[in-house]
Amino acid sequence: MAIIRHFGMVLLLMMAATKSLAQDQKQIFIYCPNERAGLHIAQQTEAGWQEIGQLCSSDYGTWGAEKRMYHPSVARAADGSWRLVFQVNDKSPMLAVAYSKDLINWRPQDYPIMSTRQCLSPVVFPNDNGTFDIYYKTKGGDKRWVSASADFRRFSKDEASQIGDAAWIRNTITIDGKEVDGSLFDITSTELQAITSHFDRQAKDWKICQERMHNDKKDSPVNIPTPITASLKVSGQEKPISDKLIGIFFEDISYAADGGLYAELIQNRDFEYIPKDHRGWSATTSWSGSKPVVVISVDPLSENNPHYAVLGNDTIYNEGWDGIAVTAGAKYDFSMFVRNIPAPQGKSKLKKDFVISLITEDGSVIAQAKVKTQGADWRKYEAVLTATQTCEKTRLAVAGLKDEKAGIDIVSLFPRETFMGRKNGLRKDLAQVIADLKPKFVRFPGGCMSHGQGLENIYHWNHTVGPLQDRKPDFNIWGYHQTRGLGFFEYFQFCEDIGAEPLPVLAAGVPCQNSSNNRQGIGGQQGGIPMKDMPAYIQELLDLIDWANGDPATSKWAKMRADAGHPKPFNLKYIGIGNEDIISTVFEERYEMICKAIRAKYPDIKICGTVGPFHTPSADYLEGWDFTKKHPDLQYMVDEHYYESTGWFMHHRDYYDNYDRNSAKVYLGEYAASTDAKRPNVETALAEALYLTDIERNGDIVEMTSYAPMLAKDGHHNWNPDMIYFSNTEVRPTPAYETQRLFSVYGGDRYVASELKINVTHESGSSEKPTFAHRLGASVVRNSKTGKTYLKVINALPEPLILNVEGLTIPAGTKAIGFDGLPEDQQVVLKTEETTGKSLTLPPYSIRVIEL
């Protein structure tokens, strides 16, 4: 009966293409121009078919190789809602499905898994009971069928089907001279108007967001007086706002950890590099020798680090991270684990001496020490190297004396001077620049690195604590290796050292939606952690809280923390679950399980959820907030991410004005403004500063913010722009860094209401804001603990600003701190000036902060 019913539906659809339409009905065509273009809609006009725009695109799998939509099929339910199915590729055992009420906003895609590796050309049909039937073909030409629930979230096991080929008959139209296949539908004029209005709004928004400060010379905002005069009326009315607005987000991206903040100078110290870390890498990457470097795994130091090198009467060299930079007179702590290997004849003395050296590019030895070892068991040996000259690029030499064989592992070299003098510590200059931000919290360890490249690469915090040799290394989603030397103990310790709240963020039971296909051909979220394994994963997250806050006398996890040198609890208050995930059914099921378990055992812990990788009106944002509001008891706040143009930030300064104050708080966890230069400059920093004045104004709903990414090492950029760039010998904060520092150091917990009024006379006599008002900003906050008040003023225009301040007493000689420059300047220097009283003068493209 199903075969007859659906064949009849196909005929009815074809007849609908030629029937005369009622006056209120409009005809649309839904199609896919090509596999990279996504789902499009066109309307019938007197001049023929006219393109309206893209409805949605594929979210499946990796960028580049995937994210393609093949053979989409669309059906409309009796209630007027829509269903979409499409083929993701020709090798994965899954279909892509999506739901929409209005063709404008689509729920995030789900990817139900089928029984065959080829799920080709799917088609979908509605049933009278509200469910849907989906048919697809296999590579061999077989046909299979699956039933979908009315909400398009539940799918039966697929079965063989005998449905006829007529089910795959498509409509064809010509648009822009090209013939395309798709589906015809009748919708009402009101529905069509809503769709076209949506695309009109998108086009207008896109146009205004193209505004750039660096274009001011040739396309200056109209009617700007010289100078600009304005008044700021401070009313004195206050409201409480978050005292944690400005923090930092640390992710091991662009060599931010190993080779960066983590002070270890030896690369591949554990001989555990593999091709999965990076194509072409092996256990000997960054090592070389006077003879071929021998690596074995018999009787290893640790099962988590099974490989080690074997030395006889030879020398091996390590290149470090683009070389090893040393300073004359500085001390460097060397260590390695050694086991002397018995000779086959049993005559070995089980003793071996080593000479450890730092060697310059011209072969000069500028530091040297001798290490004597004995015994067949693994043992740690240490030495101190003192550099006799400064050199940006040395290499480490480990020379074995005589012929006896010995295994060496975890070959390490740290500067004696680490941040706060910590063992296994952080690079002092880089950590200090971060500390100078005075961040109120630190989000770690990611980012995409938290949920990982596939299920096997999900970040497990418990693999990163304990003795270094027992920590479990892994590949990094950003294309290199994680030693885990910078682990959760070091993250928490750093937070404590700089007075910031720790905010660990871990996976919500799903990997990154951009994951490549696994052995079964399943990519993206890969179906999530199997439900049978979720209790163990949830326990792992509960153990983290126990490790951070528990009593060493009663908790094995807390005892591990105490054994590492921190008997007192870390006083963890926040935990993040998920990172810019697709808010799919697979995600929601696992996220809810995790949150309920944490809330049940640790009700005081504040959970931070996620609403996807982009702002409104993205599918994940809408679904994420809908889920959050339907489950208000699960989370304290949600994490929003968006990277946008400077024009977007300047024209969306009211973004949080209408957020529901009774709903979850907002953590703007990743954001940055950018221009075509793809580097932070004065333009991006001022756009971010303008936006942050409105974040402060909305600090009653926005709890936290953090710029992203924070760190990038020269020559290893996975992403641009970044807040801080660095090499082995220098740290280069950007204008974005200075904006973050000004808003953090001069932050408060009370917002003081004020009104900025620009003095412009309109020819019409109207009182409308001038068209350049979005380029000026001001904010007043007060720190209730210190009693200090801070005024921030931003002038993102090419003319000077004279601002008269009313309601605040600014004594003559009061210091104003800030920066200015040309929009394209990528380096700025903070300057301090004296004010002349209640009138402030700001140069073009500038920010000033006054402390009262």
Segments predicted by a language model, with ranges:
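Carbohydrate-active catalytic/glycan-binding domains of CAZyme proteins
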Residues: L21-N223
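The substrate-binding groove and active-site-proximal loops of carbohydrate-active enzymes
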Residues: F414-R422, Q469-G485, I522-P535, K573-E588, ...
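Noncatalytic carbohydrate-binding groove/subsite architecture in carbohydrate-active enzymes
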Residues: T394-V398, D551, R561, D581, ...
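Extracellular and organelle-lumenal recognition/adhesion modules and their flexible linkers in secreted
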Residues: E211-T483, E501-L503, N518-K532, Y602-K606, ...
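Carbohydrate-binding surface patches
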Residues: T771-I810, Y845-V849
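C-terminal beta-strand-rich structural cap/linker in extracellular carbohydrate-active enzymes
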Residues: K831-L852
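Aromatic/acidic polysaccharide-binding cleft in carbohydrate-active enzymes
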Residues: K244, E251-I253, P511-Q513, S663-G747, ...
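Bacterial Sec-dependent N-terminal signal peptides
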Residues: M1-D24
